[in-house]
Structures are given as structure tokens and as C-alpha cells.
Amino acid sequence: MKIVLQRVQQSHVSVNQHIVGQINQGLTLLVGISPTDTDAELQWLARKCLDLRLFPDPEGNPWQASIQDIQGEILVVSQFTLYGDCRKGRRPSFSGSAKPDQAEQIYEKFVAFLRQSGLKIETGQFGAMMQVEISNDGPVTLLLEREAKPA
């Protein structure tokens, strides 16, 4: 699984010019799913997103508070293109991403893990063409990756 995490002042996602998910201060997560992702990766990454200290504390000291500490909001958007491989040719190959049916199940599990936090969690529409508007704060953008361990 790959996640592009962005600290945001606000963010929203639209499908056919209708907003389907929007948040104020918090995190926008662009999530790519691989066919080997297991519950262990999902839980680890959900916990990492919830626990990372990316926000200032009430005194303004940077990197002191997590999304949970500030009771922020999270927008989760599926993005299979994170597994795009551009090493050959002029078109990316997406063979490293999970097939849509499998990816949707894994994505929904990941969202469910985040929802256990009690924070406001909004999502895009899985598999749809979406427009995402992000007001990046900082900017703070991180790439989180966790692949299944070989058996």
C-alpha cells in the first residue's frame, strides 16, 4: 500500500461536479492498493496516519500534535495511479495495483480502521473520475509505504 499524505487547511473531492467528501483542517490521504496488501499493512498505515505528529501544539510548537490530538478530519481518496510504473515506454503500466474488486475491499477496510478513531472521515467515490481540491498546509506532504512481508 502507498499513501500520499498531505496536511491540509481544507480539502474536498467531487464527482460530476458534485462534492462527495469534504473536510476542514486535517489530512488528505491519496491511497494506492497493491494485490498483496493484508490487514497487517492496513492497520499499520492507519495507525501511522493517526499517530504522526504533523501539527503544532496549542503553543505553536511545530510537529507536536497528531490528527487525533487536534481532533482533525481526514479525507481518503483511492488512487491506483500511485502504482504506475513509467520505466518502459511512454504510457504508465498499472499492473502493480490491485484489480478494482480486490482494491475496493481493501480500501473499505482501511477506511474502517481509520473510522475506529472516532474522527470525521470522508471519502471519495471508489473507481470514479474525481476532482480533488487540496489546500495544502505548509506544505506538508509525505509518502508512506508498507508492503506485505514475504512468506
UniProtKB/Swiss-Prot annotation:
Family: Belongs to the DTD family.
Source species: Picosynechococcus sp. (strain ATCC 27264 / PCC 7002 / PR-6)
Localization annotation: Cytoplasm
Reactions that this protein is recorded to catalyse: glycyl-tRNA(Ala) + H2O = tRNA(Ala) + glycine + H(+); a D-aminoacyl-tRNA + H2O = a tRNA + a D-alpha-amino acid + H(+)
UniProt protein name: D-aminoacyl-tRNA deacylase
Broad enzyme group: hydrolase
Source superkingdom: Bacteria
One function term, GO molecular function aspect: D-tyrosyl-tRNA(Tyr) deacylase activity
Residues spanned by motif Gly-cisPro motif, important for rejection of L-amino acids: 138-139
Organism classification: Bacteria, Bacillati, Cyanobacteriota, Cyanophyceae, Oscillatoriophycideae
Domain text: A Gly-cisPro motif from one monomer fits into the active site of the other monomer to allow specific chiral rejection of L-amino acids.
Record EC number: 3.1.1.96
